[in-house]
Amino acid sequence: MLEIFDVNHTLLSETKSGELFTLRKETFKDRLNWAVQCTDGMEFDQYDNNNTTYLFGIKDNTVICSLRFIETKYPNMITGTFFPYFKEINIPEGNYLESSRFFVDKSRAKDILGNEYPISSMLFLSMINYSKDKGYDGIYTIVSHPMLTILKRSGWGIRVVEQGLSEKEERVYLVFLPVDDENQEALARRINRSGTFMSNELKQWPLRVPAAIAQA
């Protein structure tokens, strides 16, 4: 059974936090060479706190993918770490989430789920499902140009709000991710083009997909 679900930072076990922060170090420091702080082989920062909720994709008790949500009324990476990258950032008041630290461990995904399973798109859809379930109005995030391309290809009707430059002089984008019924249906339909999944299963929260179906 592949499961994607939410866990608040206050409820995160020491074992799972260690696994998560180790995978984040391997992704953001070792592979992407981002300017992140690492301690004892793990990557975590001041935004990993009691205001944080994580989405986990787990199969056989193994973390495959994850991301971090913080309500925009709290300190977050858009208004903190990434703020100097942009000439102007204006996040509207409202019931919005900030998303960061999105990753998929490609080697784990391949070994456990196979090559045909659309895990990135599944995590995108889970962001919508979670937001709708909890009553949020949308998601803001900062992405690189390659990640922007992946988001556009997913079928999600995203909107670029601002463009900036990172510390490495690379383009980065402040993006709004809508969480309405139309975008939920668009992502679910694209994921299920082969008819592998039950359509109603894809729109549930938490998201649970039987392993036999996931590997079909």
Swiss-Prot record:
The chemistry this enzyme catalyses reads: a fatty acyl-[ACP] + S-adenosyl-L-methionine = an N-acyl-L-homoserine lactone + S-methyl-5'-thioadenosine + holo-[ACP] + H(+)
GO terms for MF = N-acyl homoserine lactone synthase activity
Q: Which SUPFAM superfamilies match?
A: Acyl-CoA N-acyltransferases (Nat)
User: A GO BP term, please?
Assistant: antibiotic biosynthetic process
**Which EC main class describes this enzyme?**
transferase
Q: Does the keyword Transferase apply?
A: yes
Q: Which family does it belong to?
A: Belongs to the autoinducer synthase family.
Provide the function of this protein. Required for the synthesis of OHHL (N-(3-oxohexanoyl)-L-homoserine lactone), an autoinducer molecule which binds to CarR and thus acts in the control of the biosynthesis of carbapenem antibiotics.
Q: Which PANTHER family match?
A: ACYL-HOMOSERINE-LACTONE SYNTHASE (PTHR39322), ISOVALERYL-HOMOSERINE LACTONE SYNTHASE (PTHR39322:SF1)
> What is the protein's name according to its record?
Acyl-homoserine-lactone synthase
